[in-house]
């Protein structure tokens, strides 16, 4: 299934705002409204993506709870989880670490004293996106298994 944004015609007025503002989280988004190749759409308020949930502020808890999210899928590495872990009472968490290829390569470049130019950055990002798919098939399969078995809204996130 390929997700594409709805066209820009007037009929695309959304019933909800895609960006959901929180004081501590800067990039919490509703993925509802995206259309698949066969014309079906992702339902609003059932699938969210976010940056670190560890930054959710106490004042944000009520708004977060109103969304009804009961499951989080945490794509962060073990080191990232240790640096900024979270515990939200109403949330069951599935940890599916996806190590970004670009991080390992950048560390190697720094160790070797190499500099990063625009062309190399573009190449690294392309390789990273390929590696996400090639190296993390089990994690993505588990991700979709969770999505298909949940009867409440789900949020997935990485560090950002």
Model-assigned labels for residue ranges:
Residues 1-155:
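Cys-dependent protein tyrosine phosphatase-like superfamily
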